[in-house]
Every structure is written in structure tokens, then in C-alpha cells.
């Protein structure tokens, strides 16, 4: 256990020590809650990037995809799409479509994902700026704000959502054949190298 997670615990202790020394409010409940809430989006992006790296690829456009899908969601809500969950689903579909575009381009062109996603990163960010007119978006419904500000069982909704997604992905990659098969091509790549060299 320590060999696997020791580095994480050491870093957490170092952050806690320096955070406490810099501010007396660092380890307060409110501050820790805000850290988890603000990190929930990063965690979701990281889980998506995890799969890209798992298959020996990389996606540099995850931030741009988040921005564009988020902007589409915001525009749908401001356009009167109700309930707001429908707008959220629309944003998720846009994000999935953008990811599919990346995958198709990598597959069709044969170029490295680094190059493809570097280009689509700029394209997606440009589209986001056009849609938003380079301005912030505000004026969301109270239902939307109240939903994500809720704290059932004392846990913020964004944190709960991140935990649910993490559990689903953990189950997928460790308990289902389709998930374990993702590991196989990468895990055994080194075993094919001697054969290639001999041929």
C-alpha cells in the first residue's frame, strides 16, 4: 500500500504543513470544502485524460473541450432550455462529439495524438470565443445554481458527481473485461519488441 500511495500521502502532508503555516484558515472545513469543489472539474478532466494516456496517447484539447461544451451548456440554458438538465446533457453530447472528432482524426490521418489535439485545442478555443463573443456568460436560473450549491449529507454536489464517475470508471477498468482489455495492449507492448527486432 505504501509503495503505491506513499508519495501521495507525503505530498498531502507537505501541502497541509505549508498551507497551515501560510494561513490559519487553510485547514478549516469551509476552505477544504471549497478546495474539493474547485478540484472536482479538474478531477473529471483528469479521469478522461487517464484513458487517453492508458492507450499510449494524449489529449491536449481537454481544456478547450471543457470550455466549448460548458459554453454550449450555458447558451442553451440562457436560450430557455428547460429543465437545465437537458442543457447539461446537450453539453455532455457536445463534449463527446469533440472527443470523437479527435479520435477519428488520429485514426484517419495516422498522426500522433499530440499533433492532432494541439491543433484541435486551438480550433475549439476559437469556436468558444466566437460563441461567447469573448465575454463572460451570466444570468443562470436559480434552479441550476441551487442544484450545484446543494450539500446533501454535507457533501457538495460537484464532489458527489466526481466520486460517482470515479467509482464507475474504477469498476469499468478493474472489474469488467472491456476495461481490462484497455490495459492489455499497453501492458504487453514491451513483449512484442524483441520479436519485431528479430524479424
Please identify what each model-predicted range represents:
Residues 10, 14, 44-45, 69, ...:
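Alpha-helical transmembrane segments in multi-pass membrane proteins
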Residues 44-48, 68-69, 97-101, 124, ...:
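Membrane-embedded alpha-helical core segments of multi-pass
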Residues 109, 113-176:
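Transmembrane helix-bundle core of multi-pass membrane transporters
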Amino acid at each position: 500500500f505504501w509503495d503505491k500511495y506513499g508519495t501521495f500521502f507525503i505530498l498531502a502532508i507537505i501541502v497541509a504543513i505549508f498551507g497551515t503555516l501560510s494561513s490559519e484558515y487553510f485547514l478549516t472545513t469551509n476552505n477544504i470544502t471549497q478546495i474539493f469543489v474547485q478540484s472536482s472539474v479538474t478531477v473529471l478532466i483528469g479521469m478522461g485524460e487517464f484513458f487517453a494516456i492508458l492507450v499510449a496517447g494524449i489529449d491536449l484539447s481537454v481544456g478547450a473541450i471543457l470550455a466549448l461544451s460548458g459554453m454550449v451548456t450555458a447558451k442553451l440554458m440562457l436560450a430557455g432550455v428547460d429543465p437545465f438538465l437537458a442543457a447539461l446533457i446537450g453539453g455532455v453530447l457536445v463534449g463527446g462529439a469533440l472527443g470523437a472528432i479527435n479520435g477519428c482524426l488520429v485514426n484517419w490521418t495516422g498522426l500522433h495524438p499530440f499533433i492532432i489535439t494541439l491543433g484541435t485545442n486551438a480550433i475549439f478555443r476559437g469556436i468558444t470565443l466566437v460563441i461567447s463573443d469573448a465575454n463572460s456568460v451570466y444570468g443562470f436560473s436559480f434552479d441550476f445554481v441551487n442544484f450545484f450549491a446543494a450539500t446533501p449529507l454535507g457533501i457538495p454536489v460537484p464532489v458527489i458527481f466526481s466520486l460517482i464517475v470515479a467509482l464507475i470508471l474504477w469498476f469499468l477498468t478493474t472489474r469488467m473485461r472491456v476495461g481490462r482489455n484497455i490495459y492489455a495492449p499497453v501492458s504487453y507492448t514491451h513483449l512484442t519488441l524483441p520479436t519485431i527486432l528479430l524479424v
